Amino acid sequence: MYTEINEMLTPKVLKVQAESPYKARIVLEPLERGFGHTLGNALRRILLSSMPGSAITEASIDGVLHEYSTIEGVQEDVVDLLLNLKSVAIKLTVGNEAQVTLNKEGPCQVTAGDIQLTHGQEIINPELVIANLNEKGKLNMTLKVERGIGFHNTDAFVRYHDDEIEKKTVGKLKIDNSFSPVKKVAYFVDSARVENRTDLDKLTIELETNGTIDAEEAIRISASILQRQLHAFVDMKFEESRADNKERNDFDPVLLRSVDDLELTVRSANCLKAENIHYIGDLVQRTESELLKTPNLGKKSLTEIKDVLASRSLSLGMKLENWPPASLGE
């Protein structure tokens, strides 16, 4: 029987059993009875609804004004084309938005690998069939790719650019899509044993992604999102005892935390510290181009940093007035 919360068991074993680069089974044990379902359900919901990623959100097709059109020489109608585009797994490594093109003449089979990329994009499933063209078929498309979180609903989703609302225009076909790179998640809770105790939980999470992120990274990001949402409860205070607290409260508490809390890889963390980036507030004020000038910090590390910041609703290039607070580090 416990008398203090720090006497409760915490997980000691974390196993990652990779079935493929994009499919894995994560095992966490031992957990106090009931915590398997508590953590498993929370992580599953976050993985399915709140993961950052990239997707095609708009298509402009030559000769097509609306999604109920057909294209001469193309076996699929426009609705089917848009459905196929939703399945393209595309990764943005630079920026939050990009335009790519697709230009093909028949007879041929058009695949995701035929999409003409610019700098900073990668197609993970180039074998995906988008359309089939006969000898009269011609397909010219301009596609808009965006980064985001969760599900993109064209009816309810309104983007703001320079304080102007981006409205749907004729010829630009909006695509309902999910930014989440996670395709399937399931969790199971089994019994675990530690010495004479047999009433413990073992949590197993089975996870499959679309390939733009590996399963282990997806679990790490989802846990970081959950941690951030619970942070307010951990640091809950009812009275301000110091005048410095007012200055600190002008900033999001996350910005005042060490970059170590981002749980970056050792390489990325060391690169940031070498540039005297010790707090998250220091990091978010840097731009992508500034970080890429950092010795030993490449595009892979930059993408990792952007994904972790996005999971906390932060981004690079932010402007923070009166940073740093005088009391930072006390």
From Swiss-Prot:
Keyword line? DNA-directed RNA polymerase, Nucleotidyltransferase, Transcription, Transferase
Question: Which region ranges are annotated with the description Alpha C-terminal domain (alpha-CTD)?
Answer: 251-330
What are the boundaries of the region Alpha N-terminal domain (alpha-NTD)? Answer: 1-237
What InterPro entries is this protein classified in? DNA-dir_RNA_pol_insert (IPR011262), DNA-dir_RNA_pol_RpoA/D/Rpb3 (IPR011263), DNA-dir_RpoA (IPR011773), RBP11-like (IPR036603), RNAP_asu_C (IPR011260), RNApol_insert_sf (IPR036643)
User: Cellular component terms, GO, for this chain's entry?
Assistant: cytoplasm; DNA-directed RNA polymerase complex
Which GO BP terms, alphabetically?
DNA-templated transcription
Q: What does the record give as EC number?
A: 2.7.7.6
At the top of the EC hierarchy, this enzyme's class is transferase
Q: Which reaction does it catalyse?
A: RNA(n) + a ribonucleoside 5'-triphosphate = RNA(n+1) + diphosphate
A Pfam family of the record is RNA_pol_A_bac
Which GO molecular function annotation, any one, does this entry have? DNA binding
What is the protein's quaternary organization? Homodimer. The RNAP catalytic core consists of 2 alpha, 1 beta, 1 beta' and 1 omega subunit. When a sigma factor is associated with the core the holoenzyme is formed, which can initiate transcription.
- Name the family: Belongs to the RNA polymerase alpha chain family.
Domain comment (free text):
The N-terminal domain is essential for RNAP assembly and basal transcription, whereas the C-terminal domain is involved in interaction with transcriptional regulators and with upstream promoter elements.
Q: What is the recorded function of this protein according to its Swiss-Prot or TrEMBL entry?
A: DNA-dependent RNA polymerase catalyzes the transcription of DNA into RNA using the four ribonucleoside triphosphates as substrates.
- Its recorded name reads DNA-directed RNA polymerase subunit alpha
Which organism does this sequence originate in? Legionella pneumophila (strain Paris)
